[in-house]
Amino acid sequence: MRKIYIIIVAVLSICIWLLLTNNPKQIPRASTSIKEKLAAVKDYKYYLDKGNNTIGKEMQKMDLVIVEPIEMQQQYIEAAQEQGALIYGYINAMEADKWNETLYNQLQEDDFYKDEYGKKMYFDEWDSYLMDMTSAHYQDLLLEEIQKQIVDKGLDGVFLDTVGNIDSFLPPEEQVKQNQAMLTFIKKIKQHYNGLSVAQNWGFQTLANYTAPYIDFIMWENFSYDVVGEDDWSLEKIAQLEHIREKFGTQVMTIGFSNETQSRALAEKHHFKFFYNPAGSYYNSWH
């Protein structure tokens, strides 16, 4: 009797397996990961102003859109996500913009970066100040901003702008401190917000030496052939980013400001994502 029971159970198990195998709809499938979706991106946009019905429809055609969540209306964000677009929200990491009064008015004096003479660094073009990422108070403010602007609005990830300021504007000894603090901050984002996807703008050495294991894509602005096509430093960075992508899956999103055809061809040669923005580093116009 026991043998008959075992045979019946085995036959039933095989029948159930065959039914499931021949009916794919019955088989639960793992959702595509953020990294896989980013690797498959064909069309993306970086846009930091308000939306309208026309822009909202264009967003739905994109694989990835980076928006200013303070400006972009929630209805357009959600509609684009429903069509499969990834939406990342802009957060200015190493600068404080005076236009963002709600955040700016919460800053303390120790949150601002100061040089050896105690002088702040002001960027006239953007009406912003360089910040000190080693400030625990400043990190807490940014985490609150990410909660309010990214997590609460259901965005797919956070895009940290101005990370490259560390390499570009600070002396070597200060770079180490700020890079270590940036790494700590990004780890906090991951811990606080259930592994939220994080991207960064510029900061190639920061990426290579510190943040790569936690960054899903890096942006390279002015990836224009006349700037990078035959430049030794740029070619070295291209190779470095390819190595990082192979090791960590970090995608490279490039933006060309000139020479669209050649710039796009160079990006595609290295399997970088590309879009053309003749307005340069101003992203307040969709076209």
Each predicted region: which residue ranges?
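Alpha-helical interaction segments
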Residues: 6-7, 36
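Hydrophobic membrane-insertion alpha-helices, especially the h-region
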Residues: 7-18
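Glycan-processing catalytic domains of CAZymes
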Residues: 15, 21-287
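Positively charged n-region of N-terminal signal peptides that target proteins for export
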Residues: 1-4
